[in-house]
Amino acid sequence: AEAMRRAAAVGKPIVAHCEVDELLKGGYIHDGVYCREHGHKGICSESEWRQVERDIKLAAETGCQYHVCHVSTKESVELIRRAKAAGLKVSGETAPHYLLLCDEDLQEDGRFKMNPPLRGREDREALRQAVADGTIEVIATDHAPHTAEQKSRGLAGSAMGIVGLECAFPLLYTYLVKPGLLTLEQLVERMSMAPRRIFGLGGGLQAGEP
């Protein structure tokens, strides 16, 4: 709460990776069907949305602008939607892999290990709808590359993280714009103008602009 009060006092947002440590319990993929069928340790959805819920309450109390990074659960989407409807300065972001994949796509391969993990099909569909209707305003890559060796130890032993910088736009264009879920203009807005607006960076491409 104190951090939000201080941020609000200087007109800056709080940006959060939402994760309740006590709920992780050593998990490394989504606590879903694949996890249980293959004997892995799961990360429950509550570990994300519980912090989103808490932080939104604090944002309401303090008047702080609040931005949620890499949203992956349908519950987080609904909390952000309600906060926006209540007029709070709350925004959210997700990443291409949460819009295009789910835990049904998992393989015994470290390339499928990231944090937050790939969630269930319902979460993916909720995120797609949220990006389409503007509840989730930003798509970012959460680009986190590792060496081939670091990603070669299977789901349990590989480092967390997925690459996305090079392929984010073409994948989103192919699987969201071409089928009609987003227009090209909306995709560009989610990936460029919206984050500039949220973080007070101005708009457009001009000399001297960040």
Language-model-derived ranges and their functions:
Residues 1-139:
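Histidine/acidic residue-rich metal-binding segments in metalloenzymes
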Residues 37-63, 112, 133, 137-139, ...:
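His/Asp/Glu-enriched, well-ordered alpha-helical/loop segment
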